Amino acid sequence: MQNNSFLARLVRGNLVLQILAGILLGAAMATFSPEYAQKVGLIGNLFVGALKAVAPVLVFILVASSIANQKKNQHTYMRPIVVLYLFGTFSAALTAVILSFLFPTTLVLATGAEGATPPQGIAEVLNTLLFKLVDNPVSALMNANYIGILAWGVGLGLALHHSSSTTKAVFEDLSHGISQIVRFIIRLAPFGIFGLVASTFATTGFDALAGYAQLLAVLLGAMAFIALVVNPMIVYYKIRRNPFPLVLQCLRESGVTAFFTRSSAANIPVNMALCEKLKLDEDTYSVSIPLGATINMAGAAITITVLTLAAVHTMGIEVDLMTALLLSVVAAVSACGASGVAGGSLLLIPLACGLFGISNDIAMQVVAVGFIIGVIQDSAETALNSSTDVLFTAAVCQAEHEKRA
Protein backbone atom coordinates (compact mmCIF):
# COMPACT_ATOMS: atom_id res chain seq x y z
CA MET A 1 0.00 0.00 0.00
CA GLN A 2 2.86 2.32 0.90
CA ASN A 3 4.54 1.61 -2.46
CA ASN A 4 1.30 2.41 -4.28
CA SER A 5 0.93 5.73 -2.47
CA PHE A 6 4.58 6.60 -3.25
CA LEU A 7 4.03 5.82 -6.96
CA ALA A 8 0.78 7.80 -6.94
CA ARG A 9 2.57 10.81 -5.39
CA LEU A 10 5.33 10.44 -7.99
CA VAL A 11 2.84 10.42 -10.88
CA ARG A 12 0.76 13.30 -9.51
CA GLY A 13 3.78 15.38 -8.42
CA ASN A 14 5.09 18.51 -10.14
CA LEU A 15 7.36 17.24 -12.93
CA VAL A 16 9.49 20.41 -13.05
CA LEU A 17 10.25 20.18 -9.30
CA GLN A 18 11.05 16.48 -9.67
CA ILE A 19 13.46 17.27 -12.54
CA LEU A 20 15.09 19.99 -10.40
CA ALA A 21 15.56 17.43 -7.61
CA GLY A 22 17.12 15.04 -10.17
CA ILE A 23 19.57 17.77 -11.28
CA LEU A 24 20.63 18.55 -7.68
CA LEU A 25 21.02 14.87 -6.73
CA GLY A 26 22.98 14.17 -9.94
CA ALA A 27 25.36 17.09 -9.28
CA ALA A 28 25.81 15.97 -5.65
CA MET A 29 26.59 12.39 -6.66
CA ALA A 30 29.12 13.56 -9.29
CA THR A 31 30.84 15.68 -6.63
CA PHE A 32 31.01 13.06 -3.86
CA SER A 33 31.21 9.80 -5.82
CA PRO A 34 32.37 10.33 -9.44
CA GLU A 35 32.91 6.59 -10.04
CA TYR A 36 29.35 5.66 -9.08
CA ALA A 37 28.02 8.74 -10.91
CA GLN A 38 29.48 7.45 -14.19
CA LYS A 39 27.68 4.13 -13.66
CA VAL A 40 24.25 5.76 -13.14
CA GLY A 41 24.77 7.45 -16.50
CA LEU A 42 23.18 4.24 -17.85
CA ILE A 43 19.78 5.47 -16.54
CA GLY A 44 20.20 8.72 -18.45
CA ASN A 45 21.19 6.92 -21.65
CA LEU A 46 18.17 4.62 -21.32
CA PHE A 47 15.87 7.65 -20.93
CA VAL A 48 17.29 9.40 -24.02
CA GLY A 49 17.17 6.10 -25.93
CA ALA A 50 13.49 5.61 -25.03
CA LEU A 51 12.60 9.14 -26.19
CA LYS A 52 14.56 8.72 -29.44
CA ALA A 53 12.90 5.33 -30.03
CA VAL A 54 9.32 6.54 -29.60
CA ALA A 55 9.70 9.92 -31.37
CA PRO A 56 9.79 8.75 -35.06
CA VAL A 57 6.75 6.46 -34.62
CA LEU A 58 4.89 9.18 -32.68
CA VAL A 59 5.48 11.78 -35.42
CA PHE A 60 4.55 9.42 -38.28
CA ILE A 61 1.31 8.15 -36.70
CA LEU A 62 0.27 11.55 -35.29
CA VAL A 63 0.78 13.38 -38.61
CA ALA A 64 -0.96 10.66 -40.67
CA SER A 65 -3.84 10.46 -38.16
CA SER A 66 -4.40 14.22 -37.85
CA ILE A 67 -4.43 14.75 -41.66
CA ALA A 68 -6.62 11.67 -42.34
CA ASN A 69 -9.13 12.82 -39.69
CA GLN A 70 -9.08 16.50 -40.66
CA LYS A 71 -12.59 17.92 -41.14
CA LYS A 72 -13.51 19.96 -44.20
CA ASN A 73 -12.78 23.71 -43.92
CA GLN A 74 -10.61 23.03 -40.84
CA HIS A 75 -7.62 25.40 -40.77
CA THR A 76 -4.03 24.65 -39.84
CA TYR A 77 -1.63 27.49 -39.19
CA MET A 78 1.59 26.20 -40.71
CA ARG A 79 2.51 29.18 -42.90
CA PRO A 80 2.80 31.78 -40.08
CA ILE A 81 4.67 29.24 -37.90
CA VAL A 82 7.25 28.54 -40.64
CA VAL A 83 7.66 32.32 -41.16
CA LEU A 84 8.38 32.70 -37.41
CA TYR A 85 10.84 29.78 -37.51
CA LEU A 86 12.82 31.38 -40.36
CA PHE A 87 12.63 34.93 -38.95
CA GLY A 88 13.69 33.69 -35.49
CA THR A 89 16.69 31.83 -36.93
CA PHE A 90 17.83 34.89 -38.93
CA SER A 91 17.34 37.16 -35.86
CA ALA A 92 19.54 34.79 -33.85
CA ALA A 93 22.33 34.93 -36.46
CA LEU A 94 22.12 38.75 -36.58
CA THR A 95 22.21 38.99 -32.76
CA ALA A 96 25.29 36.73 -32.69
CA VAL A 97 27.04 38.97 -35.27
CA ILE A 98 26.36 42.11 -33.19
CA LEU A 99 27.54 40.50 -29.92
CA SER A 100 30.65 39.10 -31.62
CA PHE A 101 31.59 42.62 -32.77
CA LEU A 102 30.83 44.15 -29.35
CA PHE A 103 32.89 41.46 -27.56
CA PRO A 104 35.50 40.18 -30.07
CA THR A 105 36.86 36.79 -29.02
CA THR A 106 40.13 35.14 -30.04
CA LEU A 107 40.74 31.40 -29.73
CA VAL A 108 43.59 29.18 -28.67
CA LEU A 109 43.09 26.76 -31.53
CA ALA A 110 42.78 23.07 -30.71
CA THR A 111 43.23 19.92 -32.74
CA GLY A 112 41.11 16.79 -32.61
CA ALA A 113 38.40 17.21 -35.25
CA GLU A 114 40.36 15.57 -38.08
CA GLY A 115 38.01 12.60 -38.47
CA ALA A 116 35.00 14.77 -39.22
CA THR A 117 34.00 15.68 -42.79
CA PRO A 118 32.20 19.00 -43.19
CA PRO A 119 29.92 19.66 -46.19
CA GLN A 120 31.61 21.30 -49.20
CA GLY A 121 29.05 24.08 -49.61
CA ILE A 122 25.52 25.23 -48.93
CA ALA A 123 24.35 23.40 -52.09
CA GLU A 124 25.49 20.09 -50.52
CA VAL A 125 23.55 20.83 -47.31
CA LEU A 126 20.36 21.64 -49.26
CA ASN A 127 20.94 18.62 -51.54
CA THR A 128 21.15 16.33 -48.47
CA LEU A 129 17.91 17.79 -47.11
CA LEU A 130 16.15 17.33 -50.47
CA PHE A 131 17.13 13.65 -50.67
CA LYS A 132 15.96 13.12 -47.08
CA LEU A 133 12.51 14.13 -48.37
CA VAL A 134 12.33 11.10 -50.71
CA ASP A 135 13.84 8.56 -48.31
CA ASN A 136 12.37 5.06 -48.02
CA PRO A 137 9.70 5.18 -45.22
CA VAL A 138 11.21 2.24 -43.31
CA SER A 139 14.68 3.80 -43.57
CA ALA A 140 13.27 7.20 -42.48
CA LEU A 141 11.72 5.62 -39.35
CA MET A 142 14.85 3.56 -38.57
CA ASN A 143 17.23 6.52 -38.94
CA ALA A 144 14.92 9.15 -37.38
CA ASN A 145 14.90 11.19 -40.61
CA TYR A 146 12.12 13.62 -39.66
CA ILE A 147 11.95 15.30 -43.07
CA GLY A 148 11.23 11.90 -44.65
CA ILE A 149 8.87 10.88 -41.82
CA LEU A 150 6.89 14.13 -42.24
CA ALA A 151 6.69 13.64 -46.02
CA TRP A 152 5.39 10.06 -45.68
CA GLY A 153 3.07 10.97 -42.79
CA VAL A 154 1.52 13.83 -44.78
CA GLY A 155 1.29 11.64 -47.92
CA LEU A 156 -0.38 8.74 -46.08
CA GLY A 157 -2.72 11.12 -44.25
CA LEU A 158 -3.84 12.71 -47.54
CA ALA A 159 -4.28 9.26 -49.13
CA LEU A 160 -6.43 8.08 -46.19
CA HIS A 161 -8.44 11.32 -46.00
CA HIS A 162 -11.28 9.77 -48.04
CA SER A 163 -11.00 6.28 -46.52
CA SER A 164 -13.67 4.66 -44.34
CA SER A 165 -14.35 5.96 -40.83
CA THR A 166 -13.13 2.60 -39.42
CA THR A 167 -9.67 3.07 -40.98
CA LYS A 168 -9.48 6.63 -39.65
CA ALA A 169 -10.54 5.42 -36.19
CA VAL A 170 -7.71 2.84 -36.19
CA PHE A 171 -5.14 5.60 -36.84
CA GLU A 172 -6.70 7.82 -34.19
CA ASP A 173 -6.59 4.99 -31.62
CA LEU A 174 -2.96 4.27 -32.56
CA SER A 175 -2.02 7.93 -32.04
CA HIS A 176 -3.72 7.95 -28.61
CA GLY A 177 -1.95 4.70 -27.66
CA ILE A 178 1.49 6.04 -28.61
CA SER A 179 0.74 9.31 -26.79
CA GLN A 180 0.08 7.26 -23.62
CA ILE A 181 3.49 5.57 -23.99
CA VAL A 182 5.08 9.02 -24.41
CA ARG A 183 3.40 10.31 -21.23
CA PHE A 184 4.81 7.34 -19.31
CA ILE A 185 8.36 7.97 -20.63
CA ILE A 186 8.14 11.69 -19.79
CA ARG A 187 7.16 10.85 -16.19
CA LEU A 188 10.54 9.07 -15.95
CA ALA A 189 12.38 12.32 -16.85
CA PRO A 190 13.58 13.03 -13.27
CA PHE A 191 15.41 9.67 -13.16
CA GLY A 192 16.82 10.10 -16.68
CA ILE A 193 18.06 13.63 -16.01
CA PHE A 194 19.55 12.52 -12.68
CA GLY A 195 21.64 9.94 -14.59
CA LEU A 196 22.62 12.39 -17.35
CA VAL A 197 23.71 15.13 -14.92
CA ALA A 198 25.65 12.72 -12.70
CA SER A 199 27.60 11.13 -15.59
CA THR A 200 28.23 14.44 -17.43
CA PHE A 201 29.59 16.21 -14.34
CA ALA A 202 31.66 13.17 -13.33
CA THR A 203 33.13 12.60 -16.81
CA THR A 204 33.74 16.15 -18.03
CA GLY A 205 33.84 18.46 -15.05
CA PHE A 206 34.19 22.12 -15.95
CA ASP A 207 37.99 22.54 -15.80
CA ALA A 208 38.26 22.05 -19.58
CA LEU A 209 35.84 24.93 -20.14
CA ALA A 210 37.69 27.56 -18.09
CA GLY A 211 40.00 28.52 -20.98
CA TYR A 212 37.04 29.37 -23.19
CA ALA A 213 35.11 31.50 -20.68
CA GLN A 214 34.72 34.56 -22.96
CA LEU A 215 33.65 32.48 -25.95
CA LEU A 216 31.05 30.71 -23.81
CA ALA A 217 29.89 34.04 -22.37
CA VAL A 218 29.25 35.43 -25.89
CA LEU A 219 27.53 32.20 -27.01
CA LEU A 220 25.32 31.88 -23.94
CA GLY A 221 24.69 35.64 -23.83
CA ALA A 222 23.38 35.58 -27.41
CA MET A 223 21.18 32.55 -26.66
CA ALA A 224 19.80 34.15 -23.47
CA PHE A 225 19.11 37.41 -25.37
CA ILE A 226 17.13 35.51 -28.02
CA ALA A 227 15.23 33.45 -25.41
CA LEU A 228 14.39 36.34 -23.05
CA VAL A 229 14.26 39.44 -25.30
CA VAL A 230 13.81 38.67 -29.02
CA ASN A 231 11.43 35.69 -28.69
CA PRO A 232 9.13 37.52 -26.21
CA MET A 233 9.00 40.48 -28.65
CA ILE A 234 8.01 38.13 -31.51
CA VAL A 235 5.38 36.43 -29.32
CA TYR A 236 4.00 39.80 -28.16
CA TYR A 237 3.64 40.86 -31.81
CA LYS A 238 1.49 37.74 -32.40
CA ILE A 239 -0.65 37.53 -29.23
CA ARG A 240 -0.70 41.22 -28.13
CA ARG A 241 -0.41 40.49 -24.41
CA ASN A 242 2.30 39.74 -21.83
CA PRO A 243 4.39 37.01 -23.52
CA PHE A 244 6.48 36.02 -20.48
CA PRO A 245 4.11 33.46 -18.86
CA LEU A 246 4.16 31.49 -22.15
CA VAL A 247 7.90 32.07 -22.75
CA LEU A 248 8.86 30.93 -19.24
CA GLN A 249 6.54 27.91 -19.36
CA CYS A 250 8.13 26.76 -22.63
CA LEU A 251 11.65 27.25 -21.24
CA ARG A 252 10.73 25.46 -18.00
CA GLU A 253 8.84 22.49 -19.45
CA SER A 254 10.62 22.03 -22.79
CA GLY A 255 13.97 23.82 -22.48
CA VAL A 256 15.08 22.12 -19.25
CA THR A 257 14.53 18.60 -20.63
CA ALA A 258 16.15 19.52 -23.97
CA PHE A 259 19.17 20.98 -22.12
CA PHE A 260 19.96 17.62 -20.53
CA THR A 261 18.95 15.26 -23.35
CA ARG A 262 20.88 17.44 -25.88
CA SER A 263 18.63 16.14 -28.67
CA SER A 264 15.84 18.01 -30.48
CA ALA A 265 14.56 14.65 -31.76
CA ALA A 266 14.39 13.17 -28.24
CA ASN A 267 12.52 16.30 -27.09
CA ILE A 268 9.76 16.00 -29.73
CA PRO A 269 7.53 13.85 -27.43
CA VAL A 270 8.06 16.36 -24.58
CA ASN A 271 7.04 19.24 -26.88
CA MET A 272 3.99 17.33 -28.15
CA ALA A 273 2.87 16.71 -24.56
CA LEU A 274 3.31 20.43 -23.74
CA CYS A 275 1.27 21.44 -26.82
CA GLU A 276 -1.49 19.08 -25.66
CA LYS A 277 -1.33 20.61 -22.16
CA LEU A 278 -1.63 24.12 -23.70
CA LYS A 279 -4.69 22.86 -25.65
CA LEU A 280 -3.23 23.84 -29.02
CA ASP A 281 -4.60 22.67 -32.37
CA GLU A 282 -3.41 19.06 -32.85
CA ASP A 283 -3.53 19.25 -36.66
CA THR A 284 -1.05 22.13 -36.45
CA TYR A 285 1.37 21.02 -33.72
CA SER A 286 1.63 17.42 -34.95
CA VAL A 287 3.37 18.86 -38.05
CA SER A 288 4.98 22.06 -36.71
CA ILE A 289 6.87 20.41 -33.80
CA PRO A 290 8.78 17.77 -35.85
CA LEU A 291 9.29 20.36 -38.61
CA GLY A 292 10.67 22.80 -36.00
CA ALA A 293 13.09 20.11 -34.77
CA THR A 294 14.45 20.10 -38.33
CA ILE A 295 14.44 23.75 -39.49
CA ASN A 296 13.97 25.99 -36.43
CA MET A 297 17.62 26.38 -35.44
CA ALA A 298 18.21 29.70 -33.66
CA GLY A 299 20.80 28.07 -31.37
CA ALA A 300 22.66 26.53 -34.33
CA ALA A 301 22.72 29.91 -36.14
CA ILE A 302 24.30 31.50 -33.03
CA THR A 303 26.92 28.73 -32.72
CA ILE A 304 27.92 28.95 -36.40
CA THR A 305 28.13 32.77 -36.33
CA VAL A 306 29.97 33.21 -33.01
CA LEU A 307 32.59 30.51 -33.69
CA THR A 308 33.14 31.71 -37.27
CA LEU A 309 33.67 35.33 -36.15
CA ALA A 310 35.95 34.10 -33.33
CA ALA A 311 38.07 32.43 -36.04
CA VAL A 312 37.98 35.67 -38.07
CA HIS A 313 39.18 37.72 -35.07
CA THR A 314 41.87 35.12 -34.28
CA MET A 315 43.21 35.38 -37.85
CA GLY A 316 43.09 39.21 -37.73
CA ILE A 317 40.75 39.48 -40.73
CA GLU A 318 38.84 42.77 -41.17
CA VAL A 319 35.10 42.33 -41.71
CA ASP A 320 32.83 44.96 -43.31
CA LEU A 321 29.11 45.39 -42.62
CA MET A 322 27.91 43.73 -45.84
CA THR A 323 30.05 40.62 -45.24
CA ALA A 324 28.70 40.41 -41.68
CA LEU A 325 25.12 40.60 -43.01
CA LEU A 326 25.94 37.94 -45.62
CA LEU A 327 27.32 35.75 -42.80
CA SER A 328 23.97 36.16 -40.96
CA VAL A 329 22.10 34.91 -44.03
CA VAL A 330 24.53 32.01 -44.65
CA ALA A 331 24.44 31.03 -40.95
CA ALA A 332 20.62 31.12 -40.90
CA VAL A 333 20.28 29.01 -44.09
CA SER A 334 23.03 26.60 -42.94
CA ALA A 335 21.40 26.28 -39.51
CA CYS A 336 18.12 25.24 -41.16
CA GLY A 337 20.10 22.37 -42.71
CA ALA A 338 21.96 21.44 -39.50
CA SER A 339 19.76 18.37 -39.01
CA GLY A 340 20.96 17.12 -42.41
CA VAL A 341 24.62 17.10 -41.35
CA ALA A 342 26.24 14.49 -39.09
CA GLY A 343 27.70 16.52 -36.20
CA GLY A 344 25.11 19.27 -36.58
CA SER A 345 25.94 22.95 -36.32
CA LEU A 346 29.66 22.53 -35.51
CA LEU A 347 30.43 20.90 -38.86
CA LEU A 348 28.78 23.80 -40.69
CA ILE A 349 31.43 26.20 -39.30
CA PRO A 350 33.95 25.47 -42.14
CA LEU A 351 31.19 26.42 -44.60
CA ALA A 352 30.82 29.87 -42.98
CA CYS A 353 34.61 30.23 -42.57
CA GLY A 354 34.90 29.82 -46.35
CA LEU A 355 33.26 33.28 -46.72
CA PHE A 356 36.40 34.83 -45.22
CA GLY A 357 38.95 32.67 -47.04
CA ILE A 358 39.88 30.76 -43.86
CA SER A 359 41.52 27.43 -44.73
CA ASN A 360 39.81 24.14 -43.92
CA ASP A 361 42.66 23.19 -41.51
CA ILE A 362 42.04 26.27 -39.36
CA ALA A 363 38.26 25.86 -39.63
CA MET A 364 38.49 22.26 -38.36
CA GLN A 365 40.54 23.46 -35.37
CA VAL A 366 37.68 25.86 -34.60
CA VAL A 367 35.31 22.87 -34.81
CA ALA A 368 37.55 21.08 -32.26
CA VAL A 369 37.12 24.07 -29.89
CA GLY A 370 33.37 23.62 -30.40
CA PHE A 371 33.66 19.99 -29.31
CA ILE A 372 35.53 21.03 -26.14
CA ILE A 373 32.80 23.47 -25.08
CA GLY A 374 30.09 21.16 -26.46
CA VAL A 375 28.88 20.00 -23.05
CA ILE A 376 27.52 23.53 -22.46
CA GLN A 377 27.15 24.84 -26.04
CA ASP A 378 25.21 21.84 -27.37
CA SER A 379 22.93 21.71 -24.31
CA ALA A 380 22.07 25.43 -24.45
CA GLU A 381 21.64 25.31 -28.24
CA THR A 382 19.20 22.39 -28.03
CA ALA A 383 17.26 24.03 -25.18
CA LEU A 384 16.80 27.22 -27.24
CA ASN A 385 15.95 25.38 -30.47
CA SER A 386 13.45 23.00 -28.90
CA SER A 387 11.66 25.42 -26.55
CA THR A 388 11.25 27.87 -29.45
CA ASP A 389 9.42 25.18 -31.47
CA VAL A 390 6.64 25.07 -28.85
CA LEU A 391 6.74 28.82 -28.21
CA PHE A 392 6.16 29.85 -31.84
CA THR A 393 3.56 27.11 -32.38
CA ALA A 394 1.67 28.24 -29.25
CA ALA A 395 1.91 31.94 -30.19
CA VAL A 396 0.46 31.37 -33.68
CA CYS A 397 -2.25 28.92 -32.52
CA GLN A 398 -3.39 31.26 -29.72
CA ALA A 399 -3.34 34.33 -31.99
CA GLU A 400 -5.32 32.58 -34.76
CA HIS A 401 -7.78 31.09 -32.26
CA GLU A 402 -8.49 34.54 -30.78
CA LYS A 403 -8.93 35.98 -34.30
CA ARG A 404 -11.59 33.38 -35.10
CA ALA A 405 -13.30 33.54 -31.68
From Swiss-Prot:
- The principal location of this protein is membrane
Q: Does the keyword Disulfide bond apply?
A: no
GO MF annotation, one: neutral L-amino acid:sodium symporter activity
Q: Which GO terms describe its cellular component?
A: plasma membrane
Does Transmembrane appear among the keywords? yes
One Pfam family in the UniProt entry: SDF
* Assigned keywords, A-Z: Amino-acid transport, Cell inner membrane, Cell membrane, Membrane, Symport, Transmembrane, Transmembrane helix, Transport
List all membrane-crossing ranges. 13-33, 43-63, 81-101, 140-160, 191-211, 215-235, 297-317, 338-358, 362-382
Q: Which domain of life is it from?
A: Bacteria
- Which GO BP terms sit in this record? serine transport; threonine transport
UniProt topology in membrane: Multi-pass membrane protein
> Reaction catalysed by this chain?
L-serine(in) + Na(+)(in) = L-serine(out) + Na(+)(out); L-threonine(in) + Na(+)(in) = L-threonine(out) + Na(+)(out)
Localization, UniProt: Cell inner membrane
| Stated role | Involved in the import of serine and threonine into the cell, with the concomitant import of sodium (symport system).
Similarity comment? Belongs to the dicarboxylate/amino acid:cation symporter (DAACS) (TC 2.A.23) family.
NCBIfam families assigned: PRK13628.1
UniProt-recorded name of the protein: Serine/threonine transporter SstT
Q: Which organism is it from?
A: Vibrio cholerae serotype O1 (strain ATCC 39315 / El Tor Inaba N16961)
Q: What is the lineage of its organism?
A: Bacteria, Pseudomonadati, Pseudomonadota, Gammaproteobacteria, Vibrionales
